[in-house]
Swiss-Prot record:
The lineage of its organism: Bacteria, Pseudomonadati, Pseudomonadota, Betaproteobacteria, Burkholderiales. The active site is at C82, H177, E179. Homodimer. PROSITE patterns: GATASE_TYPE_1 (PS51273), GMPS_ATP_PPASE (PS51553). InterPro entries: Class_I_gatase-like, GATASE, GMP_synth_C, GMP_synth_GATase, GMP_synthase, GMPS_ATP_PPase_dom, NAD/GMP_synthase, Rossmann-like_a/b/a_fold. This is GMP synthase [glutamine-hydrolyzing]. ATP binds at S231, G232, G233, V234, D235, S236, S237.
Length: 539
């Protein structure tokens, strides 16, 4: 039986990063909404509990989310983060006030008290000998009086109680966010909590996950047939391989050509899955169906819903041909769930995801989502462990709605054709340009292997079609044609991302090729927005 950490979600948009950091330490963790019952908490079998941040204020009184009382009575270690710290303080007899100075962004925190959690963890030491941590803050309220039994663990000039600890009861809390990459020692702090404070062993790994997931799929599905929408992207590909490992020929993959695929996508998918892996794949041409329903629709949410709805309809028609088809499998992963504020979330919806937001209540198939609790990097590791080709697994992610969310405004076949060719040029140039580190660029992958080229060095790169025209000059003539934006980001978990610092020469080559080779485009721009504030996809 694995050790496991229970994470209670109070609505932070980065709650799942806590789970990611715990898993990085080799310990299994799951996220549940804060309002689970005391009975659930008592029966879960947690080795420790982490309370996430959230958008609410404990000062709101009875209206504010509260920690289940059983959490404080279990006798296992508890760590509160941001709102989790404030809720812990208020419920255990401390006081919280609305801070006069709000703290959002980088901060330097002084450690106090030589606690078991922070002992020997620091980024630098002041001339006075104080250990300091470089952290990320995001709060307005703050604790102004600690509960009985707690001592000061960390402080900043604007937040005198930035961390507190009750070592006897093994309760700890921070006002800053150790789960985000901006907190330099965050990973070490969480590892210390789960290993040293909670006593967990590093006993959660991908081979074990595969064995457990395969068994779970078999129990869930039984002798039923499963159909899966195969896009050729990383998530659906790994989901297909995992499900095929579990139930073999009970899985049928449905590859839908909706006219919004990348260049030569259909050919590649059929060769890879049907011929190389022996998976049952049905190729359906539904271009007219999708384009017809998308005509005149420009709202991003409406487009996503339509594309999701039409996918489901295609699957239902296909399922009707199979008497035993009872399940619709999807490659939904954790970031999809988080941004849709789906099941288990108390956060605010950012945008609907094709995998989790477009399914009507009339769906006649049950959902099978074997990757729902995994981050993107974990999905890739799973794919490699399942024996999928490295280049397939480490291919950049592609959204379920395809180019439909990369064409701003109304989707037209003409726009899709232009974008497909521009995107292919961008990817080709990234692949053939050797990687040389530039300021702000990561020099190696997560496993320490140096990047071969700029495609490897970026986590996701693509072109976006802008439905606006600009004036240009080609030869001796005036042009009035469309604009394409290039987007490339670097990230570990797709929850936050930095724009990729691509070499100017590379960008110049891409721009020249697109303008010269794609008739109908005369201007190329580069997106230098991070996430947040922007999302990775434009729609």
């Amino acid at each position: 039986m694995h050790s496991k950490i229970l994470i209670l979600d109070f609505g932070s948009q980065v709650t799942q990063l806590i789970a990611r950091r715990v898993r990085d330490s080799g310990v299994f963790s799951e996220v549940f909404p804060y309002d689970v019952s005391d009975e659930f908490v008592r029966n879960y079998g947690a080795a420790g509990v982490i309370l996430s941040g959230g958008p609410n204020s404990v000062i709101e009184g009875d209206e504010s989310p509260r920690v289940p009382q059983a959490v404080f009575e279990l006798g296992v270690p508890v760590m509160g983060i941001c709102y989790g710290m404030q809720a812990m303080a208020e419920q255990l007899g401390g006081k919280v006030e609305n801070g006069k100075v709000r703290e959002f962004g980088y901060a330097e925190v002084r450690a106090h008290g030589h606690t078991a959690l922070l002992k020997d963890i620091s980024d630098f030491t002041t001339p006075e000998g104080h250990g300091m941590l470089k952290v990320w803050m995001s709060h307005g309220d703050k604790v102004n009086e600690m509960p009985p039994g707690f001592k000061l663990m960390a402080s900043t000039p604007n937040c005198p109680i930035a961390g507190m600890a009750d070592e006897e009861r093994r309760m700890y809390a921070f006002q800053f966010h150790p789960e985000v990459t901006h907190t330099v020692q965050g990973k070490a702090i969480i590892a210390r909590f789960v290993h040293d404070i909670c006593g967990c062993k590093s006993d959660w790994n991908m081979p074990d996950y595969i064995a457990e997931a395969v068994e779970k799929i078999r129990q869930q599905v039984g002798s039923d047939e499963v159909i899966l929408g195969l896009s050729g992207g990383v998530d659906s590909s790994v989901a297909a391989a995992l499900i095929h490992r579990a139930i073999g020929d009970q899985l049928t993959c449905v590859f839908v050509d909706h006219g919004l695929l990348r260049l030569d996508e259909g050919k590649m998918v059929m060769e890879m899955f049907a011929e190389s892996l022996g998976v049952n794949v049905i190729h359906i041409d539904a271009v007219d169906q999708f384009m017809g329903h998308l005509a005149g629709v420009s709202d991003p949410e409406a487009k996503r819903k339509i594309i999701g709805r039409e996918f489901v309809e295609v699957f239902q028609v296909e399922a009707g041909k199979r008497k035993n088809a009872k399940w619709l499998a999807q490659g939904t992963i954790y970031p999809d769930v988080i941004e849709s504020a789906g099941k288990g979330k108390k956060g605010h919806t950012i945008k609907s995801h094709h995998n989790v937001g477009g399914l009507p209540e009339t769906l006649n198939l049950q959902l099978l989502e074997p990757l729902r609790e995994l981050f993107k990097d974990e999905v890739r590791k799973l794919g490699v462990a399942l024996g999928l080709p490295h280049d397939m697994v480490y291919r950049h992610p592609f959204p379920g709605p395809g180019l439909g969310v990369r064409i701003l405004g109304e989707v037209k076949k003409e726009f899709a054709d232009l974008l497909r060719r521009a995107d292919a040029i961008f990817i080709e140039e990234l692949r053939k340009t050797p990687f040389v580190a530039t300021p702000g660029a990561s020099e190696a992958t997560d496993n320490g292997i140096p990047h071969r080229n700029w495609y490897d060095a970026t986590s996701q790169a693509f072109a976006v079609f802008l439905p606006v025209k600009s004036v240009g000059v080609m030869g001796d003539g005036r042009t009035y044609e469309y604009v394409v934006a290039l987007r490339a980001v670097q990230t570990q978990d797709f929850m936050t991302a930095h724009w990729a610092h691509l070499p100017h020469e590379l960008l110049g080559n891409v721009s020249n090729r697109i303008i010269n080779e794609v008739r109908g485009i005369n201007r190329v721009v580069y997106d230098i927005s991070g996430k947040p504030p922007a999302t990775i996809e434009w729609e």
